[in-house]
Amino acid sequence: MRPKYLIPGLGLVMIMAIFGYFAGCSKDNVPTNQVTEGSLTDPDFVPVQGQVDSYLDSTVQIFSAALDNSDRAPIDTQYVRGNYSPLGTNDTVTCVYINGWYIIYVAKDNAFMAFHTTDSIQFQKDSVVVESPLDMDYMHFVRRWEFASKLTSVTHTNIDGYVNLVFAGMDGEFASVNGTKNYNVEWNYVGQDSSVVALYNMDVTVDNVTIYHSPGAGWPSACPSSGTIQADIAQSYTVTKNSIPNTLTRNWIVTVSINEGVATVKVEGLNKVWSYTKDICEPSAH
């Protein structure tokens, strides 16, 4: 299953807020050593929450994509095609097994976009590489992907990312997931006399996330029951108006604690802290 990419459109209000930054309309008189509670409607925070929520949704999708390989070898081209459908006649799917790794490459290309993803999957049992997932207790999953819009004369989005996850204890009641992710979004607003390039870079750590196994059903939801996810976000806007560019940068620290499919999110930045909860999935019964 390929990840679900949710691209938050900033909208007219957000674009006006961005322009307001450069016009001196965004002011903060809080001393630099004082941290206050932020409002969820703060225009500084709204686009960040959109990216965090998108990232959380895509994380569950990534867990699901990895666990799809837990009951069958990912060498079956038709199986891969089903997971990455729909595929056009000019799209490419290749599957190979080499040096203990299953490597899947999928490329979609049409008049609107180009999408490329490579999955690398290795199974182990007692620290020894095995070919069949039915014998494993450990899975290493690596994904690299890139989505590029070809409609560059209008508002559009480009994305690329990298995932490196280890699933341990897969022969038991639950799997423990650890690893890293990198997620980059480039959002381009194209107006008649102005443009905005919004960049989001997220460096993510997945720490001891637990996913329970359902007897008789395997890993049906890939929904985490516990664990912590942390992210550092670098955000920038370059606004060009009347041929004059201006750039604004922001940095954020995100901490997510998961309890039975509910994420408690804390975002820190600009001497403020924002907190909220989000239902991300329905965990398996255990």
Task: Label each region the model flagged.
Residues 1-11:
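Bacterial N-terminal signal peptides that target proteins for export
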